[in-house]
């Protein structure tokens, strides 16, 4: 599978799938319907497009997880994490802020700063310096 490179950003073609573990030295943009059957390690920022899947854990600097993405293992970030509507994640561990949008299903969430829960989510324990829960009316 050919991955396109633009400066320090790697771009995966839509609908691609990867059978083994993937390690990217830079940022990674993943379009919708892309599948990783193994572990995904990104040394920069990760943007996972809608309806993508990761069969094992994800390690990255910052993460934006698109709607209805499924990550079967943990998501570990040294920065911020945004989990969009309907995402399913094994667990989240972030050094900075975590935002959970409506419909997210996640195990435990551990944050070094703030956990912002927008709307109704299914989760295990929420551990952070501050946990804010607001209605689903925010964009």
How would you name each of these model-derived features?
Residues 1-139:
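Extended beta-solenoid/beta-helix repeat architectures
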């Amino acid at each position: 599978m050919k991955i396109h490179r633009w400066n320090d950003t790697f771009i995966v073609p839509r609908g691609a799938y990867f059978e083994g573990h993937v390690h990217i030295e830079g940022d990674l943009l993943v379009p919708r319907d892309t599948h990783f059957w193994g572990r995904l390690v990104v040394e920069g920022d990760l943007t996972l497009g809608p309806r993508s899947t990761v069969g094992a854990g994800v390690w990255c600097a910052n993460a934006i997880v698109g709607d209805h993405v499924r990550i079967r293992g943990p998501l570990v970030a040294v920065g911020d994490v945004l989990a969009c509507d309907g995402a399913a994640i094994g667990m989240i561990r972030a050094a900075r802020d975590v935002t959970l949008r409506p419909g997210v299903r996640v195990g435990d969430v551990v944050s070094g700063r703030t956990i912002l829960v927008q709307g109704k989510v299914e989760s295990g324990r929420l551990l952070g310096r501050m946990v804010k829960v607001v209605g689903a009316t925010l964009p």
